[in-house]
From Swiss-Prot:
It comes from the Bacteria. This is Large ribosomal subunit protein uL5. Signal peptide: none annotated. GO terms for molecular function: rRNA binding; structural constituent of ribosome; tRNA binding. Belongs to the universal ribosomal protein uL5 family. Part of the 50S ribosomal subunit; part of the 5S rRNA/L5/L18/L25 subcomplex. Contacts the 5S rRNA and the P site tRNA. Forms a bridge to the 30S subunit in the 70S ribosome. InterPro entries: Ribosomal_uL5, Ribosomal_uL5_bac-type, Ribosomal_uL5_C, Ribosomal_uL5_dom_sf, Ribosomal_uL5_N. It comes from Mycoplasmopsis synoviae (strain 53) (Mycoplasma synoviae). GO terms for biological process: translation. This is one of the proteins that bind and probably mediate the attachment of the 5S RNA into the large ribosomal subunit, where it forms part of the central protuberance. In the 70S ribosome it contacts protein S13 of the 30S subunit (bridge B1b), connecting the 2 subunits; this bridge is implicated in subunit movement. Contacts the P site tRNA; the 5S rRNA and some of its associated proteins might help stabilize positioning of ribosome-bound tRNAs. PANTHER family: 60S RIBOSOMAL PROTEIN L11-RELATED. The keyword Nucleotidyltransferase does not apply.
Length: 186
């Protein structure tokens, strides 16, 4: 459904707004990378297994296990030790996940005012950190031992952050453009 919206509405709106000479210049979403780590429980093999199972439930795709690049004595971490999991979503699974994220998961975030409008890099990619994975309907609250959170990176073909932000806005991603101060939060 989101894919059809992109093709029918978003492409034409972006062509008008940014004056592209060809439809092929319009930015599109290449892939979505979802990453989750076990955090403090990296030494616990059951926690790693739980991370991989949760990622499978959330994304509908089997994750691959991520490992530590360097040893770190403070975290009791050795090189090549399992840390979590990562999934790269493309094509239909990517569109399905993005639609679920925008329409189901984000409205369930407590005190949510919109995604950070500054979370774009210079190449137009968007990064979103989610503190609780229980916002996804596939995760049962009673079955998780501890909230681990996850990272969602949306990789686009946009040349600038402005183009990428507009693309995601037209797809329905809510952004927090207002500057919240401590007084307005009270």
């Amino acid at each position: 459904m989101l894919k059809q919206k992109y093709k029918s509405e978003v492409v034409s709106a972006l062509v008008k707004e940014f004056q592209y000479s060809s439809v092929m210049e319009v930015p599109r979403i290449e892939k979505i990378v979802v990453n989750m780590t076990a955090g403090k429980e990296v030494n616990n093999s059951k926690a790693i297994e739980e991370v991989l199972n949760e990622l499978t439930l959330i994304t509908g795709q089997k994750p691959y296990q991520t490992v530590a690049k360097k040893s770190n004595a403070a975290w009791k971490l050795r090189k090549n030790m399992p840390m979590g999991g990562k999934v790269t979503l493309r094509k239909d699974r990517m569109w399905d996940f993005l639609e679920k994220l925008i329409t189901v998961a984000m409205p369930r975030i407590r005190d949510f005012r919109g995604a950070n409008h500054k979370a774009f890099d210079k190449n137009g990619n968007f990064a979103l950190g989610i503190k609780e994975e229980i916002i996804f309907p596939e995760i049962e609250f009673d079955k998780i031992r501890r909230n681990k959170g996850l990272d969602v990176i949306v990789v686009t073909t946009a040349k600038t952050a402005k183009e990428s932000k507009r693309l995601l806005e037209l797809l329905g991603m809510p952004f927090d453009d207002k500057k919240h101060t401590k007084e307005s939060a009270k």
